[in-house]
Amino acid sequence: MAIGVIATLLLFYTPVEREEPSQGGSSFGEAVKLLVPHKGTGALVLLSFIGIMCHVGIDVGTNTTAPKLLIERLVMSLNDAAFATSLYFIFRTVGSFTGSFFLRIMSNRLFFTLSVVMMLLAMIGMAVGESKAVLYTSIALVGYGNSNIFPLIFSQALLSEKDRQNEVSGLMIMGLFGGTVFPMLMGFASDAVGQVGAVLVMAVGVIYLFSYISKIKTSN
């Protein structure tokens, strides 16, 4: 307890530089205007917004599709297939913890590229895999690959509009609604052609992330 009190006192008397807030607030309309391509940063905010949608859509989509894939391809029981969700989150957590280490030894762009390649391999595996090993490996790959996409895209968007970071942050969080759009499209696709249709919808998101690679700055 004494250590906690001392730490609190030290923090209280430690000077902290605070960024002066911009004069006046921004309306919702002004924030949304940042999605319109403009001189300087071009369409980076819009591209980042779509990238966040794809990231969240793949995240939510994998959670809902992976167990169904195992049931459809391997005729598993629902209880056994539920392990797919746990496997995804295990590798997503591992990816989050190890991502900071890898970003110290490689560029942002290289790490982003490797992450997206993992996700593409995962989509191929989930689309054509017929064995437990292939499907489990694919689920693990998409979990690890998708674990650091959000912070990398988020940081690029913030760096593109340094004087409007609050507005950009809000827009990127709005991109989370991709978690509702993708499952809806995946549902339509799976009803039409089975779970491979849902995987193909997620693959479209992965392909979009490939197009975003050139927008990632190489510096850490």
Residue ranges and their predicted role:
Residues V16-S48:
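Juxtamembrane intracellular "pre-TM" segments in multi-pass secondary transporters
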Residues H38-S86, T93-S96:
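Extracytoplasmic gate region of multi-pass secondary transporters
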Residues S160-Q195:
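A late C-terminal transmembrane helix in Major Facilitator Superfamily
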Residues M1, L185-V206:
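A membrane-interface helix-boundary motif in multi-pass transporters
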Residues G95-N108, S190-D191:
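Helix-to-loop junctions at the C-terminal end of transmembrane segments
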Residues S147-K162:
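Intracellular juxtamembrane helix-capping segments at the cytosolic ends
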Residues M1-G24, F210-K217:
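C-terminal membrane-cytosol helix-exit motif in multi-pass small-molecule transporters
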Residues L110-G125:
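Structural signature of the two symmetry-related core transmembrane helices
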